[in-house]
Amino acid sequence: MRAGRGPLFLRRTDGWLLPLEVERWCARADPVDRDVLDRCEGTVLDVGCGPGRLVAELAARGRAALGIDVSEAAVEHTVRLGGQALRRSVFEHMPGEGRWDTVLLMDGNIGIGGDPSALLERVTGLLRPGGLLIAETAPEEVDERVRVHITDAHTTAGDPFPWARLGTRALLRYARGRWERDGQWTAGGRRFAALRSRSTSNSAEPAKRTAVISSQRVRNTCGGRPVPDR
């Protein structure tokens, strides 16, 4: 990640390798990415933001956006691109709980934690009622939960961690009951689905289309300009 190039893979315990598109992730947002961002509403939380191309593009558009990632290198790269980011798991406390307008799970990040149901439940707690989730799904119809290592095909880094791979149909199955379909599409060989939360907000405040990012805890390169903490 720090080098900005691969090859890197997720390696399953049976030896199967899933290539990671490090070069694309470390580049600027491409036309497919920008189309996704055009669909975002209000404040945007990019879960598993990686090197931050999407957060940086949103910031360049003047949008209130925050990336989160467990990788320090990813957070640092996001900041260098001009975005705002926190080193944090999606399952930890977030600024603006229950008030985000859009949550992104791009680049297969619906697999975070290896439990799609738990992740979708968590996202409902982050979004305002009726908030938008945009998820990038696997290019093929698959529904698997695995344990993986990050590897360059020769050596592995860190401990194994749980991951999931979902096609669009599998995602829609997991979403039944708590989510409404808001669209699905394919672009540039990539597949996406949009869902609307049906959950009620735990926040006592009404949903507002204003920044929900805490300036005390967010790394930023905005010359010290505060981002309102609602």
Question: What does each model-found stretch correspond to?
Answer:
Residues M1-R39:
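S-adenosyl-L-methionine
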Residues E41-G50:
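Conserved class I S-adenosyl-L-methionine
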Residues S71:
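Conserved SAM/SAH-binding beta-strand->alpha-helix loop
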Residues G82-E92:
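Conserved SAM-binding strand-loop segment of SAM-dependent methyltransferases
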Residues F91-V103:
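A short acidic, Gly/Pro-enriched loop at the edge of an enzyme's catalytic core
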Residues G111-R122:
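A short, conserved alpha-helix within the catalytic core of class I
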Residues G130-A138:
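Conserved beta-strand signature within the Rossmann-like core of class I S-adenosyl-L-methionine
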Residues P160-R178:
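Short alpha-helix
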